[in-house]
């Protein structure tokens, strides 16, 4: 691979690819249908009011990619031809060769092992194609579903960031999980 990963087939059901503006409507519907289910943990989802908001979100992602030499940082997760969620590097530090992975999946797509497959592919991509040495996942301490993923892939629980995020009316602590390239290979 040349590190650009515009589309990546994981298996017969799941693939990752870049967003394009033509995805706006489908992606918007996914966020609307998943709002109740995800809003507890994703404040930005609650702020999406219109198709225009999603189009803007996609444009921003594409702009970040273009500015960064075409390396993809955020992916649409495709399950049987439909957008199921997103995964990608929310933060990226070239000097230290580290990246922070974030992800979410629509309510109807839960419990099919989709996110496990996607995360495994993104970890591979991060270490092999982007040349990262360290990958982090930060999860609210009470978000047990989300915590199960890094734990399954051998991430080390490295510490707690106290009151790391403001969720509507209260702060939540984040657990920082870390995985090093030498632990993955």
Task: Annotate each PLM feature.
Residues 65-70, 155:
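Short loop/turn motifs at secondary-structure junctions and domain boundaries
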Residues 1-26, 30-37, 74-185:
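Acyl-donor (CoA/ACP) binding surface of acyl/acetyltransferases
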Residues 39-60:
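Conserved GNAT-fold acetyl-CoA-binding loop/helix
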């Amino acid at each position: 691979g040349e590190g650009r990963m515009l589309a990546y087939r994981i298996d017969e059901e799941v693939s990752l690819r870049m967003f394009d503006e033509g995805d706006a409507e489908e992606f918007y519907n996914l966020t609307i249908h998943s709002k109740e289910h995800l809003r507890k943990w994703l404040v930005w989802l609650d702020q999406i009011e219109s198709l225009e908001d999603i189009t803007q979100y996609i444009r921003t992602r594409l702009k970040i990619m273009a500015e960064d030499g075409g390396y993809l940082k955020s992916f649409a997760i495709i399950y049987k031809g439909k957008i199921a969620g997103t995964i990608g590097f929310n933060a990226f530090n070239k000097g230290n060769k580290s990246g922070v992975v974030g992800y979410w999946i629509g309510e109807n797509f839960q419990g099919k092992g989709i996110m496990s497959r996607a995360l495994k592919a993104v970890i591979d991509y991060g270490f092999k194609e982007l040349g990262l040495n360290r990958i982090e996942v930060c999860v609210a301490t009470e978000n047990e579903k989300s915590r199960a993923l890094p734990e399954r892939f051998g991430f080390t629980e490295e510490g707690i960031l106290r009151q790391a995020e403001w969720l509507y009316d209260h702060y939540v602590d984040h657990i920082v999980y870390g995985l090093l390239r030498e632990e993955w290979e």
